[in-house]
């Protein structure tokens, strides 16, 4: 379903280096409108050279701490999913996952719960068969793109207070050797932060040449808050949106690295936009009406998927393409994941401790797998 402003909006924006467009070129308004912050839920999927990963919550009520977050993987070349949640750490607070350095591993962070004040980490280089523990002595943010790793091994972690921590290598991250890259107040006080009225950081990533990036929610209407740390100074690095969005506050719900640059998911008023950067310019999709995002994620090729209300799901394959509505998803669908073959999607539906995998075949959802997760209700209370 396409939103009110039409489709196929391809616009040139600022690159990471020598940026002259985006929020850094505009002056903040004299009066500051209020902002209702939007973020993407933690349930998501991601694709690495090892395979396709999904993160979702199962079990029962979060109030009684019977919610248990799980990690599933479908190894590259395989058609079936496996439960590979790292053991030994309470995961009621949620899980955040990102591809590790060079795509040879996956890094999972545990959001604090049960009075923990830090975020345990786990790294696997064998599709979740074995996990090596690590530590972030702080609390990860409650967003799916709260961690990012560059091919060089440098790792970023977004904290719940909007600060960003950095580790020089994957080994340093696992050893708990993190240092402060910036804070929300410092980023908001920078030139691009002031000009867009930055109020929250929602995602971290890396751009070309391993440049650290951050994205968030801005008060100034019509401005997408994406920032790049080049040479120790933050610069505007986001897309310029078409004039039809000049009256909408824009919030970046997701940001990820792609083979050519970056992909982003943005909320602009009641619409969603996808955007892709090749490091020199951005291409912005046409809008799709939102009504609220219940889950979202990216494919390895820059594709984007979103779960919306009422069983709606929309996908877009990349620059120059349009949003496509999938058939209504099966009841309980918590996340989508790119299918094992060319094109298509899997829907991962949750009912208590049972995960049902549905595959989109010939325009209809077909049940292909059921995984019963051994959940010990009451073990966290």
Language-model segments: what does each one mean?
Residues 19-22:
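C-terminal motif of bacterial Sec signal peptides marking the signal peptidase cleavage site
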Residues 24-26:
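Bacterial signal peptide processing site
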Residues 38-47, 89-101, 139-151, 189-206, ...:
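Repeated scaffold domains used in trafficking and secretory/extracellular systems
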Residues 48-56, 102-108, 152-157, 208-215, ...:
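Entry beta-strands of beta-propeller and related beta-repeat scaffolds
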Residues 74-75, 124-125, 165-172, 227-231, ...:
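Conserved Ser/Thr-centered positions that define the repeating blades of beta-propeller domains
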Residues 336-381:
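Blade-level signature of beta-propeller repeat domains, shared across WD40, Kelch, NHL, RCC1
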């Amino acid at each position: 379903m396409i939103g009110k402003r039409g489709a196929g909006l391809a616009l040139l924006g600022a690159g990471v280096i020598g940026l002259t467009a985006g929020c850094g070129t505009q002056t903040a308004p004299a009066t500051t409108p209020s902002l209702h912050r939007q973020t993407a839920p933690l349930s998501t999927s991601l694709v690495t050279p090892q395979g396709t990963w999904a993160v979702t919550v199962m079990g029962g009520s979060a109030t009684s701490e019977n919610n248990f977050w799980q990690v599933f993987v479908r190894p590259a070349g395989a058609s079936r999913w496996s439960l590979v949640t790292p053991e030994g750490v309470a995961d009621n607070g949620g899980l955040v996952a990102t591809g590790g350095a060079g795509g040879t591993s996956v890094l999972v962070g545990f959001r604090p719960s049960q009075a923990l004040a830090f975020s345990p980490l786990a790294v696997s280089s064998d599709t979740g068969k074995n996990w090596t523990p690590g530590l972030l002595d702080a609390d990860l943010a409650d967003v799916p793109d709260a961690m990012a790793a560059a091919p060089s091994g440098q790792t970023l972690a977004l904290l719940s207070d909007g600060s960003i921590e950095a580790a020089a290598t994957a080994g340093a991250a696992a050893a708990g050797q993190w240092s402060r890259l910036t804070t929300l107040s410092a980023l908001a006080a920078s030139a691009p932060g002031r000009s867009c009225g930055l109020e929250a950081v929602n995602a971290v990533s890396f751009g070309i040449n391993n440049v650290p990036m951050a994205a968030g929610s801005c008060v100034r209407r019509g401005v997408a808050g994406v920032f790049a740390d080049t040479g120790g100074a933050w610069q505007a690095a986001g897309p310029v949106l078409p004039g039809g969005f000049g009256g909408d506050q824009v919030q970046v719900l997701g940001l990820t690295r792609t083979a050519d640059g970056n992909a982003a998911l943005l909320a602009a008023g009641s619409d969603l936009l996808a955007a892709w950067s090749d490091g020199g310019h951005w291409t912005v999709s046409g809008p799709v009406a939102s009504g609220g995002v219940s889950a979202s994620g990216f494919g390895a090729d820059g594709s984007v998927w979103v779960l919306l209300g009422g069983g709606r799901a929309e996908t877009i394959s990349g620059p120059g393409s349009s949003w496509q509505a999938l058939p209504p998803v099966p009841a309980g669908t918590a996340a989508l994941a790119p299918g094992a073959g060319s094109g298509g999607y899997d829907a991962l539906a949750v009912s208590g401790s049972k995960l049902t995998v549905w595959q989109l075949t010939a325009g209809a959802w077909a049940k292909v797998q059921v995984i019963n997760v051994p959940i010990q209700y009451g073990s966290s209370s």
